[in-house]
Design a protein with these regions (language model features):
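Lipid interaction determinants
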Residues: 2-3, 7-11, 17-125
Length: 125
């Protein structure tokens, strides 16, 4: 009887932990990128803690200033968005996935799963 009770408690704890993580961050696809991030100025934090400002323009151009300085192009992708910068990555395109945290920040992930940046807030251009 004790082992059944212990298994029930452990199972309930794991379920609660899974629910907590699921509520913490929601995967973001291209529809939300289009609605919430395109045509906005992003205030971002880079992985090294430095700040930058990124302009994600409606015309498909993008600029970043601060910890990095570059310009290039972006496009929507089935799982998020892709960028091609003039200098960064020698002009190679890279696609990113995103999630939105419970406090409204967007975390942007590289293909290898590392965080590329965290969007702390956005404002209209």
């Amino acid at each position: 009887m004790r082992s059944i009770l212990a298994a029930t408690v452990v199972g309930a704890s794991l379920a609660a932990a899974s629910l907590s993580v699921a509520q913490e961050a929601q995967k973001v696809g291209p529809d939300e990128v289009q609605q919430a991030l395109v045509g906005k100025v992003w205030e971002v934090e880079l992985p090294d803690g430095s700040s930058a400002t990124e302009r994600f323009n409606v015309d498909g151009t993008v600029t970043i200033h601060g910890g990095l300085n570059d310009k290039g192009y972006w496009r929507l992708w089935e799982e998020g968005y892709c960028t091609t910068w003039f200098r960064m990555r020698n002009g190679a395109e890279r696609c990113f996935t995103l999630d939105r945290t419970a406090d409204g920040k967007y975390r942007v992930y590289k293909p290898n799963g590392e965080i590329s940046m965290t969007i702390l807030g956005t404002k209209e251009q």
